[in-house]
């Protein structure tokens, strides 16, 4: 395990840190934690987030590890990790078009045609076109291959019909990278294609989903004979499952080391709550806080072990998805976060249940509520355990329904 990023990555860190000091508006930093129902901050439709995206692009801080031929910096995975670490350390907003920057862009770089790269990568980097992800459906979450959305070829267009759910930022997205069944006669994993569907058309209806957190960045999306050009299939017809696994791998591996950084800061806030309520001498509280710090230290070790393995193998942006490491890390941090936010709410006592005017929750209340979803999105903990069991421990694959498991 190597904790040394090397001279080039550390120079990038210093340069980016100085740039953040000069360009990160203090008001934007304050808005990162603003979760008032009347002024939700979770959504790039906010002009200040789009302005933040523009500044990053103009300074060359978009597409850090994208190849230079596609408009990126052509830097290594280490610089990409440093970029995310410094954003967290500075309390900076997320990149507004993050679904396209961290998931779709790299997927197109790996699987897309030359025409698709020419058409879509530039607007993604420049923040001219915003994207949402259309994978999950009401009856297809962890069992994603059971999706029911269909696409039928009509001349030079695909006609898409079906429903997606939990679609982040669909309410302002220009396009959706969507999984649809293009061969209903094929086996579940073989008849799916990865489509790029325009959102601004009569056949698309978006309905926001208001959450207990007070935000509504998630949506239901209804495709009613929506249309997409025939050339908008990424990775080849009926090969969408392989393409989607690449995208999900980027989702799990896009922030290799930032989870433990943000959770350490969150834990420091929980300690201050305990201190303010005179609970630090309580042996049970001390035990739980010590356990939390230990788990964050384990998270850090796991992150650096993953990063060391990737860099030792010469991994770049297109290789970060492989192996069991992202699944192991995702399972650990998501379950930790549910546990530690429970602890934080318990330490706050009755005050933890009180909200401000307009349903304005505190950052710790928001974390507690949102953490309920973290063992589900991006692959449930059960799915991650299957991956770790099969790829790391060499256990037999989970039997399919109706399969004879007798030995």
Residue spans of the language-model regions?
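C-terminal helix-coil-helix/basic helical segment that borders enzyme active sites and/or dimer interfaces
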Residues: 28-38, 275, 279-286, 297-358
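Glycine-rich phosphate/cofactor-binding loops in nucleotide/flavin-utilizing enzymes
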Residues: 2, 78, 82-83, 103, ...
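A short, Trp-centered hydrophobic/proline-enriched beta-strand micro-motif
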Residues: 127-135, 179
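Glycine-rich beta->alpha junctions and the first turn(s) of the following alpha-helix
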Residues: 3, 7, 204-301, 374
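Internal helix-loop-helix
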Residues: 49-128, 168-175, 296, 310-323, ...
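Glycine-rich phosphate/pyrophosphate-binding beta-alpha loops
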Residues: 140, 165-170, 212-213, 373-380
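A short core secondary-structure module
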Residues: 148, 156-157, 161-207
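Amphipathic, small/basic residue-rich leader segments at the start of a protein or domain
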Residues: 1-96, 119, 123-126, 276, ...
């Amino acid at each position: 395990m190597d904790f040394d990023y090397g001279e080039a990555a550390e120079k990038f860190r210093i340069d980016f840190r100085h740039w953040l000091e000069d360009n990160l508006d203090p008001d934007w930093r304050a808005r990162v934690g603003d979760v008032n129902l009347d002024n939700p901050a979770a959504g790039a439709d906010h002009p200040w987030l789009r302005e933040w995206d523009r500044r990053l692009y103009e300074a060359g801080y978009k597409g850090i590890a994208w190849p230079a031929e596609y408009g990126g910096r052509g830097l290594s995975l280490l610089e990409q990790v440093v970029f995310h670490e410094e954003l967290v350390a500075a309390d900076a907003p997320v990149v507004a078009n993050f679904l396209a920057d961290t998931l779709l862009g790299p997927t197109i770089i790996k699987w897309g045609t030359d025409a698709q790269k020419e058409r879509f990568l530039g607007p993604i980097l420049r923040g001219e076109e915003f994207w949402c992800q259309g994978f999950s459906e009401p009856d297809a979450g962890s069992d994603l291959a059971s999706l029911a959305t269909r696409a039928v070829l009509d001349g030079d267009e695909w006609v898409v019909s079906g429903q997606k759910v939990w679609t982040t930022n669909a309410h302002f997205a220009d396009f959706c990278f969507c999984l649809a069944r293009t061969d209903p006669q094929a086996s579940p994993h073989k008849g799916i294609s990865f489509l790029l569907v325009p959102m601004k058309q009569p056949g698309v209806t978006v309905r926001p989903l208001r959450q207990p957190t007070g935000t509504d960045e998630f949506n239901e999306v209804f495709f009613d004979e929506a249309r997409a050009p025939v050339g908008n299939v990424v990775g080849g017809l009926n090969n969408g499952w392989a393409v989607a696994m690449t995208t999900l791998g980027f989702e799990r591996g896009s922030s290799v080391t930032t989870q433990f950084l943000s959770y350490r800061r969150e834990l420091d806030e929980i300690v201050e709550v305990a201190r303010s309520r005179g609970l630090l001498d309580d042996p049970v509280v001390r035990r739980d806080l010590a356990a939390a710090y230990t788990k964050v230290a384990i998270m850090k070790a796991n992150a650096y072990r993953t990063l060391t393995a990737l860099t030792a193998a010469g991994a770049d942006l297109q290789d970060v998805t492989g192996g069991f490491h992202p699944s192991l890390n995702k399972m650990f941090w998501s379950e930790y976060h549910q546990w530690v936010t429970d602890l934080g709410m318990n330490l706050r006592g009755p005050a933890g249940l009180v909200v401000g005017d307009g349903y304005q929750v505190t950052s710790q209340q928001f974390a507690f509520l949102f953490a309920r979803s973290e063992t589900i999105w991006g692959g449930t903990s059960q799915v991650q355990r299957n991956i770790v069991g099969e790829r790391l421990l060499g256990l037999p694959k989970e039997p399919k329904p109706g399969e004879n498991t007798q030995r």
